[in-house]
Protein backbone atom coordinates (compact mmCIF):
# COMPACT_ATOMS: atom_id res chain seq x y z
CA UNK A 1 0.00 0.00 0.00
CA UNK A 2 2.21 2.74 -1.30
CA UNK A 3 1.91 5.92 0.69
CA UNK A 4 0.46 4.27 3.79
CA UNK A 5 2.74 5.00 6.74
CA UNK A 6 2.88 2.46 9.57
CA UNK A 7 4.55 2.93 12.96
CA UNK A 8 6.08 -0.10 14.66
CA UNK A 9 6.79 0.34 18.36
CA UNK A 10 9.47 -2.00 19.68
CA UNK A 11 12.90 -2.81 18.28
CA UNK A 12 13.12 -6.42 19.42
CA UNK A 13 12.91 -9.30 16.98
CA UNK A 14 9.10 -9.15 16.84
CA UNK A 15 9.13 -5.48 15.92
CA UNK A 16 11.87 -6.00 13.36
CA UNK A 17 10.09 -8.92 11.69
CA UNK A 18 6.77 -7.05 11.72
CA UNK A 19 8.55 -4.25 9.86
CA UNK A 20 10.00 -6.86 7.47
CA UNK A 21 6.53 -8.14 6.56
CA UNK A 22 5.12 -4.63 6.19
CA UNK A 23 7.94 -3.47 3.91
CA UNK A 24 7.42 -6.61 1.80
CA UNK A 25 3.82 -5.47 1.28
CA UNK A 26 4.79 -1.98 0.17
CA UNK A 27 4.09 0.08 3.29
CA UNK A 28 6.32 2.88 4.53
CA UNK A 29 7.49 1.92 8.00
CA UNK A 30 8.92 3.87 10.93
CA UNK A 31 10.23 1.82 13.85
CA UNK A 32 10.55 3.30 17.35
CA UNK A 33 12.71 1.72 20.06
CA UNK A 34 13.13 3.15 23.56
CA UNK A 35 16.64 1.72 23.92
CA UNK A 36 18.81 -0.06 21.36
CA UNK A 37 17.70 -2.38 18.59
CA UNK A 38 17.74 -6.04 19.72
CA UNK A 39 18.91 -4.72 23.07
CA UNK A 40 16.56 -6.37 25.59
CA UNK A 41 14.93 -9.83 25.68
CA UNK A 42 15.84 -10.51 22.04
CA UNK A 43 19.54 -10.69 22.94
CA UNK A 44 19.02 -12.66 26.16
CA UNK A 45 17.53 -15.85 24.76
CA UNK A 46 18.87 -19.41 24.96
CA UNK A 47 20.60 -18.72 21.61
CA UNK A 48 18.61 -21.37 19.75
CA UNK A 49 16.36 -21.47 16.71
CA UNK A 50 14.27 -24.49 17.60
CA UNK A 51 10.90 -26.15 17.51
CA UNK A 52 10.79 -26.69 21.25
CA UNK A 53 11.09 -30.42 21.89
CA UNK A 54 9.43 -30.08 25.30
CA UNK A 55 6.21 -28.74 23.73
CA UNK A 56 5.59 -32.15 22.16
CA UNK A 57 5.00 -33.44 25.67
CA UNK A 58 2.18 -30.88 25.93
CA UNK A 59 0.66 -31.97 22.61
CA UNK A 60 1.49 -28.71 20.80
CA UNK A 61 2.51 -30.45 17.60
CA UNK A 62 1.33 -27.70 15.25
CA UNK A 63 3.34 -25.06 17.11
CA UNK A 64 6.46 -27.23 16.98
CA UNK A 65 6.03 -27.90 13.26
CA UNK A 66 5.66 -24.18 12.51
CA UNK A 67 8.76 -23.35 14.55
CA UNK A 68 10.79 -26.03 12.75
CA UNK A 69 9.77 -24.58 9.39
CA UNK A 70 10.85 -21.14 10.60
CA UNK A 71 14.14 -22.58 11.87
CA UNK A 72 14.78 -23.72 8.30
CA UNK A 73 13.90 -20.25 6.94
CA UNK A 74 16.50 -18.61 9.18
CA UNK A 75 19.16 -21.17 8.19
CA UNK A 76 18.43 -20.60 4.51
CA UNK A 77 19.27 -16.89 4.85
CA UNK A 78 22.94 -17.97 4.87
CA UNK A 79 24.03 -15.32 7.38
CA UNK A 80 26.70 -17.44 9.07
CA UNK A 81 25.07 -16.49 12.38
CA UNK A 82 23.13 -19.75 12.81
CA UNK A 83 24.40 -23.33 12.55
CA UNK A 84 23.16 -26.86 13.34
CA UNK A 85 24.47 -28.62 16.44
CA UNK A 86 23.84 -31.85 18.32
CA UNK A 87 21.99 -31.83 21.64
CA UNK A 88 22.29 -34.72 24.11
CA UNK A 89 19.67 -35.72 26.67
CA UNK A 90 21.47 -37.90 29.26
CA UNK A 91 19.54 -40.91 30.53
CA UNK A 92 19.93 -41.91 34.18
CA UNK A 93 18.69 -44.96 36.00
CA UNK A 94 15.54 -44.08 37.93
CA UNK A 95 15.68 -40.35 37.12
CA UNK A 96 13.89 -38.08 34.68
CA UNK A 97 11.69 -39.13 31.81
CA UNK A 98 12.16 -42.73 30.65
CA UNK A 99 14.41 -43.35 27.66
CA UNK A 100 11.59 -44.71 25.48
CA UNK A 101 9.60 -41.50 25.97
CA UNK A 102 12.55 -39.29 25.07
CA UNK A 103 13.38 -41.44 22.04
CA UNK A 104 9.76 -41.28 20.86
CA UNK A 105 9.82 -37.50 21.24
CA UNK A 106 13.01 -37.09 19.20
CA UNK A 107 11.69 -39.39 16.45
CA UNK A 108 8.55 -37.24 16.21
CA UNK A 109 10.77 -34.14 16.18
CA UNK A 110 12.68 -35.68 13.23
CA UNK A 111 9.40 -36.33 11.43
CA UNK A 112 8.15 -32.78 11.95
CA UNK A 113 11.49 -31.43 10.68
CA UNK A 114 11.43 -33.39 7.40
CA UNK A 115 13.06 -31.36 4.66
CA UNK A 116 15.42 -29.53 7.01
CA UNK A 117 18.45 -31.62 5.88
CA UNK A 118 19.63 -31.87 9.49
CA UNK A 119 20.87 -35.27 10.74
CA UNK A 120 18.45 -37.58 12.52
CA UNK A 121 18.25 -38.22 16.24
CA UNK A 122 20.10 -41.20 17.73
CA UNK A 123 20.63 -43.30 20.86
CA UNK A 124 24.17 -43.35 22.29
CA UNK A 125 26.13 -45.52 24.67
CA UNK A 126 27.39 -44.40 28.05
CA UNK A 127 30.97 -44.06 26.76
CA UNK A 128 29.92 -42.02 23.73
CA UNK A 129 27.88 -39.70 25.94
CA UNK A 130 30.78 -39.09 28.34
CA UNK A 131 33.07 -38.31 25.41
CA UNK A 132 30.56 -35.83 23.97
CA UNK A 133 29.91 -33.99 27.26
CA UNK A 134 33.15 -33.86 29.27
CA UNK A 135 32.67 -34.08 33.04
CA UNK A 136 29.07 -35.29 32.87
CA UNK A 137 27.85 -36.96 36.06
CA UNK A 138 28.66 -40.67 35.67
CA UNK A 139 26.69 -42.22 38.53
CA UNK A 140 23.65 -44.03 37.13
CA UNK A 141 24.32 -42.83 33.56
CA UNK A 142 22.92 -45.23 30.96
CA UNK A 143 23.71 -43.24 27.83
CA UNK A 144 21.89 -40.49 25.98
CA UNK A 145 19.50 -39.65 23.19
CA UNK A 146 20.65 -36.91 20.83
CA UNK A 147 18.80 -34.74 18.35
CA UNK A 148 19.77 -31.81 16.16
CA UNK A 149 18.78 -28.18 16.50
CA UNK A 150 20.20 -24.80 15.50
CA UNK A 151 22.23 -22.43 17.63
CA UNK A 152 22.47 -18.74 16.82
CA UNK A 153 23.93 -15.44 17.89
CA UNK A 154 20.57 -13.82 18.67
CA UNK A 155 21.79 -10.24 18.92
CA UNK A 156 23.85 -10.41 15.73
CA UNK A 157 21.11 -12.19 13.79
CA UNK A 158 18.48 -9.70 14.92
CA UNK A 159 20.73 -6.80 13.93
CA UNK A 160 21.36 -8.45 10.56
CA UNK A 161 17.60 -8.49 9.94
CA UNK A 162 17.28 -4.84 10.97
CA UNK A 163 20.15 -3.83 8.68
CA UNK A 164 18.43 -5.48 5.70
CA UNK A 165 15.35 -3.37 6.39
CA UNK A 166 17.26 -0.11 6.83
CA UNK A 167 18.81 -0.68 3.39
CA UNK A 168 15.28 -1.10 2.03
CA UNK A 169 14.05 2.17 3.52
CA UNK A 170 13.01 1.43 7.10
CA UNK A 171 13.09 4.63 9.18
CA UNK A 172 14.58 3.55 12.50
CA UNK A 173 14.41 5.72 15.63
CA UNK A 174 16.42 4.30 18.54
CA UNK A 175 16.44 5.85 21.99
CA UNK A 176 12.96 7.28 21.47
CA UNK A 177 10.36 5.87 23.88
CA UNK A 178 6.66 6.06 23.03
CA UNK A 179 4.77 7.47 26.01
CA UNK A 180 1.26 6.94 24.71
CA UNK A 181 -0.61 5.75 21.66
CA UNK A 182 -4.18 6.23 20.48
CA UNK A 183 -6.61 4.09 18.52
CA UNK A 184 -6.73 6.71 15.75
CA UNK A 185 -3.05 6.08 14.92
CA UNK A 186 -1.49 8.87 16.97
CA UNK A 187 1.72 8.46 18.99
CA UNK A 188 3.14 10.67 21.68
CA UNK A 189 6.94 10.80 21.75
CA UNK A 190 9.54 13.41 22.61
CA UNK A 191 6.80 15.87 23.52
CA UNK A 192 5.18 15.66 20.10
CA UNK A 193 2.16 13.87 18.66
CA UNK A 194 2.68 12.06 15.36
CA UNK A 195 -0.07 10.55 13.21
CA UNK A 196 0.19 7.29 11.25
CA UNK A 197 -2.19 5.24 9.14
CA UNK A 198 -1.81 2.39 11.64
CA UNK A 199 0.35 1.45 14.63
CA UNK A 200 1.94 -1.86 15.63
CA UNK A 201 2.55 -2.39 19.33
CA UNK A 202 5.37 -4.96 19.38
CA UNK A 203 6.87 -4.05 22.74
CA UNK A 204 7.14 -7.63 24.00
CA UNK A 205 6.67 -7.96 27.77
CA UNK A 206 5.63 -4.30 27.94
CA UNK A 207 2.82 -4.52 25.34
CA UNK A 208 -0.18 -4.57 27.68
CA UNK A 209 1.50 -2.04 29.96
CA UNK A 210 1.69 0.42 27.04
CA UNK A 211 -1.99 -0.20 26.27
CA UNK A 212 -2.96 0.39 29.90
CA UNK A 213 -1.07 3.66 30.18
CA UNK A 214 -2.73 4.73 26.91
CA UNK A 215 -6.21 3.93 28.22
CA UNK A 216 -6.78 1.12 25.70
CA UNK A 217 -8.63 -1.95 26.95
CA UNK A 218 -7.36 -5.44 26.17
CA UNK A 219 -8.96 -8.79 27.12
CA UNK A 220 -5.55 -10.40 27.53
CA UNK A 221 -2.80 -9.97 30.09
CA UNK A 222 0.91 -10.64 29.81
CA UNK A 223 2.74 -12.44 32.57
CA UNK A 224 6.41 -11.49 32.57
CA UNK A 225 8.67 -14.44 33.30
CA UNK A 226 12.34 -13.65 33.79
CA UNK A 227 14.70 -16.15 32.24
CA UNK A 228 18.35 -15.87 33.25
CA UNK A 229 21.44 -17.47 31.74
CA UNK A 230 25.10 -17.72 32.63
CA UNK A 231 27.72 -17.44 29.91
CA UNK A 232 30.68 -19.42 31.24
CA UNK A 233 34.28 -20.17 30.27
CA UNK A 234 33.66 -23.86 29.59
CA UNK A 235 33.98 -24.50 25.86
CA UNK A 236 31.58 -27.17 24.58
CA UNK A 237 31.49 -29.07 21.31
CA UNK A 238 27.94 -30.39 21.69
CA UNK A 239 24.95 -29.34 23.77
CA UNK A 240 23.25 -31.02 26.70
CA UNK A 241 19.76 -30.85 28.17
CA UNK A 242 19.52 -31.37 31.93
CA UNK A 243 16.20 -32.71 33.26
CA UNK A 244 15.12 -31.26 36.59
CA UNK A 245 13.07 -32.91 39.32
CA UNK A 246 10.17 -30.48 38.75
CA UNK A 247 9.93 -31.42 35.06
CA UNK A 248 11.74 -28.34 33.74
CA UNK A 249 14.75 -28.59 31.49
CA UNK A 250 17.94 -26.53 31.56
CA UNK A 251 20.18 -26.13 28.52
CA UNK A 252 23.98 -26.32 28.55
CA UNK A 253 25.02 -25.19 25.08
CA UNK A 254 28.07 -24.23 23.04
CA UNK A 255 28.15 -20.48 22.39
CA UNK A 256 31.06 -18.95 20.50
CA UNK A 257 34.08 -20.40 22.36
CA UNK A 258 32.16 -20.51 25.63
CA UNK A 259 29.03 -22.20 26.99
CA UNK A 260 25.64 -20.89 27.99
CA UNK A 261 23.66 -22.35 30.89
CA UNK A 262 19.98 -21.66 31.46
CA UNK A 263 17.27 -20.82 31.83
CA UNK A 264 15.52 -19.99 35.06
CA UNK A 265 11.83 -19.13 35.41
CA UNK A 266 10.95 -16.35 37.84
CA UNK A 267 7.83 -14.19 37.78
CA UNK A 268 8.78 -10.55 37.32
CA UNK A 269 7.31 -7.07 37.15
CA UNK A 270 8.09 -5.52 33.73
CA UNK A 271 8.33 -2.10 35.40
CA UNK A 272 11.42 -3.22 37.34
CA UNK A 273 14.98 -3.31 35.94
CA UNK A 274 15.62 -6.61 34.15
CA UNK A 275 18.50 -8.41 35.82
CA UNK A 276 19.15 -11.87 37.24
CA UNK A 277 18.77 -12.27 40.97
CA UNK A 278 21.48 -13.79 43.13
CA UNK A 279 19.05 -16.64 43.81
CA UNK A 280 18.88 -17.41 40.08
CA UNK A 281 22.67 -17.37 39.73
CA UNK A 282 22.97 -19.75 42.68
CA UNK A 283 20.26 -21.97 41.18
CA UNK A 284 22.11 -22.31 37.88
CA UNK A 285 25.44 -22.97 39.59
CA UNK A 286 23.78 -25.69 41.69
CA UNK A 287 22.19 -27.29 38.61
CA UNK A 288 25.55 -27.39 36.86
CA UNK A 289 27.20 -28.90 39.95
CA UNK A 290 24.60 -31.70 40.04
CA UNK A 291 25.22 -32.65 36.43
CA UNK A 292 28.83 -31.79 35.58
CA UNK A 293 32.23 -31.98 37.29
CA UNK A 294 34.13 -29.97 38.23
CA UNK A 295 31.56 -27.47 39.50
CA UNK A 296 31.60 -24.01 38.00
CA UNK A 297 33.58 -21.37 39.85
CA UNK A 298 32.38 -17.79 40.10
CA UNK A 299 35.40 -16.56 38.20
CA UNK A 300 34.33 -18.69 35.21
CA UNK A 301 31.16 -16.63 34.75
CA UNK A 302 31.76 -14.31 31.79
CA UNK A 303 28.30 -12.74 31.67
CA UNK A 304 24.93 -13.00 33.41
CA UNK A 305 22.02 -12.39 31.04
CA UNK A 306 18.36 -11.91 31.81
CA UNK A 307 15.31 -11.31 29.66
CA UNK A 308 11.53 -11.26 30.09
CA UNK A 309 9.37 -13.81 28.31
CA UNK A 310 5.78 -12.62 27.76
CA UNK A 311 3.20 -15.32 28.53
CA UNK A 312 -0.33 -14.57 27.29
CA UNK A 313 -3.26 -15.33 29.60
CA UNK A 314 -6.88 -14.11 29.75
CA UNK A 315 -7.44 -11.33 32.27
CA UNK A 316 -8.36 -12.84 35.60
CA UNK A 317 -6.08 -15.86 35.01
CA UNK A 318 -2.86 -14.23 36.19
CA UNK A 319 -2.22 -17.14 38.56
CA UNK A 320 -1.62 -19.55 35.66
CA UNK A 321 1.33 -21.97 35.82
CA UNK A 322 3.91 -20.37 33.53
CA UNK A 323 5.84 -23.63 33.17
CA UNK A 324 3.05 -25.17 31.09
CA UNK A 325 1.64 -21.98 29.56
CA UNK A 326 1.68 -21.66 25.79
CA UNK A 327 4.32 -19.60 24.00
CA UNK A 328 1.99 -19.05 21.04
CA UNK A 329 1.28 -15.48 19.98
CA UNK A 330 -1.88 -13.44 19.52
CA UNK A 331 -2.66 -10.29 17.57
CA UNK A 332 -5.27 -7.91 18.99
CA UNK A 333 -6.70 -5.07 16.89
CA UNK A 334 -8.19 -1.98 18.54
CA UNK A 335 -9.04 0.75 16.05
CA UNK A 336 -5.85 1.45 14.14
CA UNK A 337 -3.62 -0.24 16.73
CA UNK A 338 -2.43 -3.83 16.31
CA UNK A 339 -0.83 -5.36 19.40
CA UNK A 340 1.33 -8.46 19.17
CA UNK A 341 1.21 -10.52 22.35
CA UNK A 342 3.63 -13.32 23.23
CA UNK A 343 5.53 -15.42 20.73
CA UNK A 344 9.01 -16.86 20.32
CA UNK A 345 12.25 -15.71 18.69
CA UNK A 346 12.21 -18.58 16.19
CA UNK A 347 8.72 -17.79 14.91
CA UNK A 348 9.11 -14.00 14.79
CA UNK A 349 8.72 -13.97 10.99
CA UNK A 350 5.33 -15.71 11.19
CA UNK A 351 4.29 -13.36 13.97
CA UNK A 352 5.22 -10.46 11.71
CA UNK A 353 3.09 -11.88 8.90
CA UNK A 354 0.10 -12.08 11.25
CA UNK A 355 0.63 -8.43 12.17
CA UNK A 356 0.83 -7.43 8.50
CA UNK A 357 -2.47 -9.25 7.81
CA UNK A 358 -4.16 -7.10 10.48
CA UNK A 359 -2.61 -3.92 9.06
CA UNK A 360 -3.95 -4.87 5.62
CA UNK A 361 -7.45 -5.06 7.11
CA UNK A 362 -7.09 -1.65 8.75
CA UNK A 363 -5.90 -0.11 5.51
CA UNK A 364 -8.67 -1.70 3.46
CA UNK A 365 -6.47 -4.09 1.56
CA UNK A 366 -8.54 -7.18 2.43
Where are these predicted regions, by residue range?
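Flavin (primarily FAD) binding-site architecture
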Residues: 201-216
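Glycine-rich FAD pyrophosphate-binding loop
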Residues: 23-44
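C-terminal catalytic lobe of FAD-dependent flavoproteins
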Residues: 219-228, 234-236, 243-260, 267-366
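Short hydrophobic core segments
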Residues: 9, 195-204
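Conserved beta-strand-loop-beta-strand element in the redox core of flavoprotein oxidoreductases
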Residues: 180-194, 199
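Beta1/beta-strand and adjacent pyrophosphate-binding region of the FAD-binding site
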Residues: 2-14
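Dinucleotide-binding Rossmann-like beta1-alpha1 core, especially the glycine-rich loop
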Residues: 47-132, 250
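Flavin (FAD/FMN) cofactor-binding and adjacent substrate-gating region
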Residues: 91-168, 173, 180, 256, ...
Amino acid sequence: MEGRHIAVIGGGINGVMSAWALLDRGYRVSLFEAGQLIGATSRASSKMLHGGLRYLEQGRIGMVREALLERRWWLERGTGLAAPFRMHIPLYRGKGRPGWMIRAGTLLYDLLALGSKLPRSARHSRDHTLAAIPGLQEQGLLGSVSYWDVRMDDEALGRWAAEQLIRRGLQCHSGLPILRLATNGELECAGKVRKFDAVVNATGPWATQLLEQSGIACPWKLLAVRGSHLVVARPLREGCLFQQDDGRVVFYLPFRNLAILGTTEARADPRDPVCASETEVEELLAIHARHVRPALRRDEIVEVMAGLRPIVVPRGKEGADTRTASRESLTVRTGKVVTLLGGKWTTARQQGLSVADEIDRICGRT
